[in-house]
Amino acid sequence: MRILAIETSCDETAAAIVEDGRRALADVISTQIDIHRRWGGVVPELASRNHVVQVMPVVDEALSRAGVGPDGLDAIAVTSGPGLVGALLVGVQAAKALALAWQKPLVRVNHLEGHLVAAFLSETAPAFPYLGLVVSGGHTSLYAAHGFGDYRLLGQTRDDAAGEAFDKGAKLLGLPYPGGVAIDRLAKEGDARAIRFPKAIVKGADLDFSFSGLKTALLHHVKKHGLPEGKGLADLCASYQEAIVRALVEKAFRAARRLQYDRLVLSGGVAANSRLRGAVAERAREYEGMEVFLPAPRLCTDNAAMIAVAGTHAFLRGERAGADLNADPAWRL
């Protein structure tokens, strides 16, 4: 079966056509990085306006690349939450219009579920059950995945998301947007042991995260020592990044050990970070039998192919959305 999916939850306008929930026939993304760079972050109004301009062109491009017309589609899936309400509305309205015009079933998809199942687009897909760590600009959450549509939240950030900590930290250091990419690049030239930052974790046995204190520690460091340049800036980036990565890895493997999971799926935009990917792989080697699934960086950032995977299985479960489908910016998985 073939699903057309539309994703507009934040600042990427995306459309994809996926066959049988495993093979992407087309995966088109129109990025807004250049639009938001001058502001140092995503401006919701600008994001929504650009989605209006780009949503139908990316759908047309996906159909063209896949060599598929409306008659070759079984259903349409769309991200209806969580995310920016104006951005979500553009995708939802486009999907409803196409479903009506083409007389196709419509399925709503939770954006976080899309990230959790993105690994099924890789050559080697995980088997259930597995732990899913979703790390992005708006979310840092740890889930137990028991099957498609069957997830249990184990822990989440109590304040800033990891991606937000990267972006705000980069802005504080005068680095360009997107900040996580800039920090990752500079950190490769730095010493992660140069500066000691506090652990960005919640004390105790729970699996929640907290990054606001780490961000404050970076601010105090810059106020005290000034903004470094050259090797000093690289060391600061590497040390700050290491503190974020250490918290993510520690909590994920604490959950694996406690709940006796031997599969971990890493997803979300921050999962494209080279140090995080390396640290997860390194820690996994310490656990006999532990399998780690790291989707390609393109599948970690927002895309519609992952929405199509989740949409395929929602469709097979008999889920359908009606003409009253609306954006749900706070939709919890």
Swiss-Prot record:
Catalytic activity: L-threonylcarbamoyladenylate + adenosine(37) in tRNA = N(6)-L-threonylcarbamoyladenosine(37) in tRNA + AMP + H(+)
GO biological process, one term: tRNA threonylcarbamoyladenosine modification
Enzyme Commission code(s) on record: 2.3.1.234
PROSITE patterns the UniProt entry points to: GLYCOPROTEASE (PS01016)
Keywords: Acyltransferase, Cytoplasm, Iron, Metal-binding, Transferase, tRNA processing
Cofactor note: Binds 1 Fe(2+) ion per subunit.
Binding site for Fe cation: 111, 115, 302
Amino-acid positions noted as binding substrate in the UniProt annotation, renumbered to this chain: 134-138, 167, 180, 184, 273
Family matches, as Gene3D superfamilies: 3.30.420.40
Obligatory cofactor(s): Fe(2+)
Top enzyme class: transferase
Record-level GO cellular component terms: cytoplasm
PANTHER family per record: TRNA N6-ADENOSINE THREONYLCARBAMOYLTRANSFERASE, TRNA N6-ADENOSINE THREONYLCARBAMOYLTRANSFERASE, MITOCHONDRIAL
Annotated HAMAP family: TsaD
Function: Required for the formation of a threonylcarbamoyl group on adenosine at position 37 (t(6)A37) in tRNAs that read codons beginning with adenine. Is involved in the transfer of the threonylcarbamoyl moiety of threonylcarbamoyl-AMP (TC-AMP) to the N6 group of A37, together with TsaE and TsaB. TsaD likely plays a direct catalytic role in this reaction.
Family per similarity comment: Belongs to the KAE1 / TsaD family.
Protein's name in the database: tRNA N6-adenosine threonylcarbamoyltransferase
Gene name for this UniProt entry: tsaD
